[in-house]
C-alpha cells in the first residue's frame, strides 16, 4: 500500500533526522538520510555514515533485507536525489532498481552535476518518483555541500551561548558559565564533528580555553585549535593551548606579526602561524578560513569566540549557520559582554537579519538554529 500523501512530510522528516547522524563524517560528500516505509510504518533506515562508505539508500536497503522485508512493497524516502554515477561507490539508482523498489520520494535535487540525473534515471525505468517534499529542510541539510560546490572555504558554524538579555558571560573578573550541563555536552559532541574550533584573541586571553572535544565517547582526532588575533601570545604564556597541545594550535595573525619574535617562538613550540592581510575589522578571516580548508583539510569550522568576532563574521557573510544557546537567566549588567557587539548601527535597516531554521531544547536551555536570510 502506498503511503498517504499527507504522510510524506512526516517520513521525510524522519529521513532528515537520520541524515544528521552523519554530520561531519561524510565531507566532502553531503549528509543524506533514507527510510523505507511499508503500510504506513518505517521498516528500515540508513544514512551516509562516512566518506567513501555506502550511501544512505544502500544502507537502508541492506537494513530492510536483514529484516526480511519485501522491498517491492516499500516506498523509499531519501533527502537527496539518488546519485547516478560511479564514484567511490556504484550508482544508488542501480541499487534501487535492483532492489525492486517502485516508488521513491526525494527531498531535493543534487546540486552536483556529476552526480545528478538520478530522478530521470529512475523514472525512465518505470519507478514513480515524487520530488520536493520538505525541500527547504532538505536543502538546509546540505548547505555545507552546496557551499563547497562554489567556494574554497569551509562551512562555518558560529556557536554562542547567551542569557535572555544577550550576555555571553558575566562582567570581567566574575566567574561563571552561561549554559547548562546538557548544552555543554552538546558542544563537545559538535566539536567532535568539525575540523577546527576557532576563537579570537580576546577569548583566548579572557577564558584560556582548551578548545578540545572532551565528550566521553569521543575517540577520533582532536580538532585544530585556531586563534585569530592581531597580537600573538608569548610562547611562555600560561595558556592551556600552549602548555598541553601546541602541536595542534594554529594562529591566524597579521603579516607583520607573523614575522615577529613571538611568532618564531610559537613556531619553535610546534604551533602553526600564518600571516594574513588586514582591514578595518581585523585580519582577513575569509582568507584564513580558506587556508584552513586548503592546508589542513577543515571542511567544517566551529567558531566559539566573543561578540566582536561573531558580529564581524555575520556582517561579512562568513557565518553559514548560527547556533545560539539561550539560557533562561538575566544578568542585567551593562558591563557584561554581549553576544554581538562592535558595530555602529544608525537605523534598523542596518541590522543583520537571520532566518530561524530550527528550535530544540537542551534543558534548561533552548537552542536556536539560524541561517543567513
Give a label for each model feature.
Residues 25-26, 52-53, 119, 133-161:
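Proteins enriched for Cys/Gly/acidic motifs involved in redox and nucleic-acid/cofactor modification
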Residues 33:
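Helix-turn-helix
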Amino acid at each position: 500500500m502506498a503511503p498517504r500523501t499527507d504522510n510524506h512530510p512526516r517520513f521525510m522528516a524522519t529521513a532528515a533526522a537520520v541524515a544528521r547522524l552523519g554530520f561531519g563524517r561524510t565531507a566532502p560528500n553531503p549528509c543524506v538520510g533514507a527510510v523505507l516505509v511499508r503500510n504506513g510504518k518505517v521498516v528500515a533506515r540508513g544514512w551516509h555514515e562516512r566518506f567513501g562508505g555506502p550511501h544512505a539508500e544502500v544502507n537502508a536497503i541492506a537494513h530492510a533485507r536483514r529484516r526480511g522485508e519485501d522491498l517491492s512493497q516499500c516506498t523509499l524516502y531519501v533527502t537527496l536525489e539518488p546519485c547516478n554515477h560511479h564514484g567511490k561507490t556504484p550508482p544508488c539508482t542501480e541499487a534501487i532498481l535492483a532492489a525492486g523498489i517502485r516508488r521513491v520520494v526525494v527531498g531535493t535535487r543534487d546540486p552536483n552535476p556529476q552526480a545528478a540525473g538520478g530522478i530521470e534515471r529512475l523514472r525512465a525505468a518505470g519507478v514513480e518518483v515524487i520530488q520536493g517534499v520538505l525541500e527547504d529542510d532538505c536543502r538546509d541539510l546540505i548547505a555545507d555541500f552546496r557551499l563547497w560546490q562554489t567556494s574554497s572555504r569551509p562551512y562555518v558554524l558560529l556557536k554562542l551561548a547567551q542569557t535572555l538579555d544577550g550576555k555571553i558571560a558575566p562582567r570581567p573578573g566574575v566567574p561563571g558559565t552561561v549554559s547548562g550541563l546538557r548544552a555543554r555536552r552538546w558542544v563537545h559532541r559538535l566539536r567532535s564533528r568539525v575540523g577546527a574550533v576557532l576563537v579570537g584573541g580576546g577569548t583566548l586571553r579572557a577564558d584560556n580555553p582548551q578548545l578540545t572535544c572532551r565528550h566521553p565517547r569521543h575517540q577520533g582526532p582532536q580538532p585544530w585549535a585556531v586563534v585569530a588575533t592581531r597580537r600573538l601570545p608569548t610562547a611562555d604564556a600560561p595558556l592551556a593551548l600552549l602548555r598541553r597541545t601546541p602541536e595542534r594550535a594554529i594562529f591566524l595573525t597579521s603579516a607583520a606579526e607573523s614575522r615577529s619574535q613571538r611568532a618564531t617562538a610559537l613556531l619553535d613550540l610546534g604551533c602553526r602561524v600564518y600571516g594574513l592581510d588586514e582591514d578595518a575589522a581585523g585580519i582577513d578571516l575569509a582568507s584564513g578560513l580558506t587556508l584552513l580548508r586548503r592546508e589542513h583539510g577543515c571542511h567544517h569550522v566551529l567558531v566559539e569566540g566573543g561578540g566582536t568576532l561573531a558580529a564581524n563574521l555575520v556582517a561579512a557573510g562568513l557565518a553559514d549557520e548560527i547556533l545560539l544557546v539561550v539560557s533562561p537567566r538575566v544578568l542585567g549588567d551593562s558591563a557584561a559582554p554581549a553576544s554581538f557587539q562592535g558595530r555602529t548601527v544608525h537605523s534598523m535597516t542596518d541590522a543583520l537579519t537571520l532566518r530561524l531554521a530550527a528550535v530544540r531544547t537542551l534543558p534548561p536551555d533552548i537552542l536556536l538554529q539560524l541561517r543567513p536570510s
